[in-house]
Amino acid sequence: MSKILCIDYGKKRIGLSITNSIRSIAFGLDTVNSNNIICTLYKYLKYEDIDTIVIGLPIRFDNSLFPIEKDIKKFIKIINNKYPKLIIKRIDERFTSKIANYYLINTRLKINQLKKNQNFLDKDKISATILLQEYIKY
């Protein structure tokens, strides 16, 4: 079975996550500068068996869309043109950043107590992982 890649799109940074081959678990993959996303996407699509990309849908509490949705739509158009066989799915991303921040706060406290490396603590990658885990749950 092919894997699913998830994108948490931001103006400056983009978080990426990926499922295992049986699509049961989401793993944080990377955080990239938004200027490098096409090259990074190409790299993962070349070396991983991915047939679906899940992209967060930035919805406000009143159900209107955040302005960044215009950039996301342009990005999706680029993906569709370059990779027409890829399936693109959207998922409501409300609360994922808050959940990621909560996770980071709690994890940093524990890590600081243990004096370990904090490089793996990345809100964008964690947000993408939360989004993807929500997607594969259903």
Curated annotation (Swiss-Prot):
GO terms for cellular component: cytosol. It is found in: Cytoplasm. The lineage of its organism: Bacteria, Pseudomonadati, Bacteroidota, Flavobacteriia, Flavobacteriales. Belongs to the YqgF nuclease family. Its EC number is 3.1.-.-. Transmembrane segments: none annotated. The keyword Chaperone does not apply. One of its GO terms (biological process) is rRNA 5'-end processing. This is Putative pre-16S rRNA nuclease. It comes from Karelsulcia muelleri (strain GWSS) (Sulcia muelleri). It is an enzyme of class 3 (hydrolase). Could be a nuclease involved in processing of the 5'-end of pre-16S rRNA. HAMAP family: Nuclease_YqgF. The keyword Lipoprotein does not apply. Keywords: Cytoplasm, Hydrolase, Nuclease, Ribosome biogenesis. One of its GO terms (molecular function) is nuclease activity. SUPFAM superfamilies: Ribonuclease H-like (SSF53098). NCBIfam families: RNAse_H_YqgF (TIGR00250).
